[in-house]
Design a protein with these regions (language model features):
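Catalytic cores of secreted or luminal carbohydrate-active enzymes
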Residues: 1-27
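Hydrophobic, Leu/Ile/Phe/Ala-enriched alpha-helical segments that form helix-helix packing faces
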Residues: 2-6, 69, 113
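Short, charged low-complexity linker/loop segments at the C-terminal edge of domains
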Residues: 7-12, 89-90, 153-154
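Generic detection of short hydrophobic beta-strand segments and adjacent strand-loop junctions
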Residues: 10-20, 63-69, 123-129, 138
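Generic detector of short, locally flexible boundary/turn motifs and exposed helical patches
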Residues: 12-15, 32-33, 45-47, 101-103, ...
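Carbohydrate-binding surface patches
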Residues: 27-75, 81-95, 142-149
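Acidic, Ser/Thr/Pro-rich beta/coil linker or hinge segments at domain junctions
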Residues: 72-131, 135
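Beta-strand-rich recognition/accessory modules
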Residues: 128-154
Length: 154
């Protein structure tokens, strides 16, 4: 996902993120998860990587997330929403369900390889950007990552 980001990094703000010192001093072990993001922008697109993380590797329903991307080009664009979670783009979860084989068979290896490919959460959507801003609301499961790409190329 990071390899799909290009351009200049842009500021991200939110009220569900742990700060750097808290993560450095005690990691993410409190009551709540760390929901944070990285974002970048080029002349043709904007990308946002959003995560919901906790040191306790416990799956869960997650949290509602609102992502507002500002400074976009007005007009039509295409939104791509990719996801890594317990059910998508996650060969580790598939490997555990296989019984954690130390020496996967050729068939298991192919399944693992395919399950690790980045998947779209939904079909690409046509969106209309107004006032240079696009707001997106979605549920982000615990221990999951979403990658949003807003592409204004025609």
């Amino acid at each position: 996902m990071l390899g799909m980001m290009s351009g200049n990094r842009v500021d991200v703000s939110g009220d569900l993120a742990y700060d750097f010192k808290a993560i450095r001093d005690s990691s993410v072990r409190g009551v709540r998860t760390d929901i944070n993001a990285l974002a970048a922008k080029t002349s043709n697109n904007a990308t946002v990587l959003v995560w919901n993380y906790h040191d306790d590797d416990i799956q869960g329903e997650g949290s509602p997330v609102n992502v507002s991307v500002k400074g976009l080009k007005n007009g039509k664009a295409t939104l791509y929403h990719y996801r890594i979670d317990a059910a998508r783009s996650n060969s580790y979860e598939v490997w555990k369900k296989m019984g954690s084989p130390q020496h996967p068979s050729e068939k298991e290896y192919k399944i693992l390889e395919k399950s690790g490919q980045l998947e779209l959460l939904s079909k690409p959507q046509k969106v209309n950007i107004k006032n240079s801003e696009l707001s997106l609301n979605f549920q982000l499961p615990r221990q999951a990552v979403s990658f949003l790409k807003i592409d204004y190329k025609k």
